Amino acid sequence: MSLYPEIEPYDHGMLDVGDGNHVYWETCGNPHGKPAVVLHGGPGSRASPGLRRYFDPAAYRIVLLDQRGAGRSLPRASAPDTDMSVNTTAHLMADLERLRVHLGIERWLVWGVSWGSVLGLRYAQTHPGVVTELVLTGVATGSNAEVALLTRGLGNIFPEAHERFLAELPPDARDGNLPAAYNRLLESPDPAVRERAARAWTDWETATIPAPPGSVARYQDPDFRMGFARTVTHYWGNDHFLGDGNDEGVVIRDAHLLKGIPGTLVQGSLDFGNLLGIVWRLHHAWPDSDLVIVDEAGHDAGTTGDEALLAATDKYARGGTAE
């Protein structure tokens, strides 16, 4: 099973979501089809055209957006004067609700990758009445334990890269909240300091979470690199803005709020970025979910993962029934 053919949007726009922010959105596929919204990763990445291809364009009304500060949304997080205090998980969920209402959609399927899975899960827990299904891959829950693994624990597997990662920080900042320490550098008034920090952060990302060549190439764009690093460290350094109790994971703690929402979780067994054990616990706390484990696959679950994602969206387009 291959991805659906490339398609172009039939409509797009910039939605004023307040706080001086305008969010880019686009719609593809069938204007009268089953609504689905796609949540990209990062935080701070963008909605790439390839994400349109996980849905049957004859069956779905596919909505994509660039989250605050990312991609084509304005202002960009890469601009040093962009106010990041109005870029939080609560703001992003409110933006989704504004967009849903703007497009006249009553309920929609939520499809998320990596950080998009965290946002999608929390959105569904907060607004369960508007979510028909969840399809998630490269699944994370945004817990502090996951951030500690990504910024410290993986140093046991990639010691040389981790040494370089720590070397960019002042010595007195290497034992504390590493994302917050990097974020302070990325907020520096000195452009050279900001650029070194952005490059060091994305170098660590590419060393530990292998991705398709196209995804790695984007880090060579200074504007993308800066916006991505600034946004990720802003979220990771602030507990993903998920509130108290996130050391062990607010999303799994509140999994009961997903009751009645069908979901499909697709995870590579060798995903160092989001360990399978986290997804396993989420799956068992959410009885309405199906878990597809892709053997010997990483954060990008590859062709087998794509097949599972396509099977999920095809199934939900048929009302949740298998072929």
UniProtKB/Swiss-Prot annotation:
One of its GO terms (cellular component) is cytoplasm. It catalyses: Release of N-terminal proline from a peptide. The keyword NADP does not apply. Keywords: Aminopeptidase, Cytoplasm, Hydrolase, Protease. Coiled coil: none annotated. The keyword Cytoplasm applies. Its EC number is 3.4.11.5. GO terms for biological process: proteolysis. The active site is at 114 (nucleophile), 271, 299 (proton donor). InterPro entries: AB_hydrolase_1, AB_hydrolase_fold, Peptidase_S33, Pro_iminopeptidase. Residues 37-301 form the AB hydrolase-1 domain. Belongs to the peptidase S33 family. Specifically catalyzes the removal of N-terminal proline residues from peptides. This is Probable proline iminopeptidase.
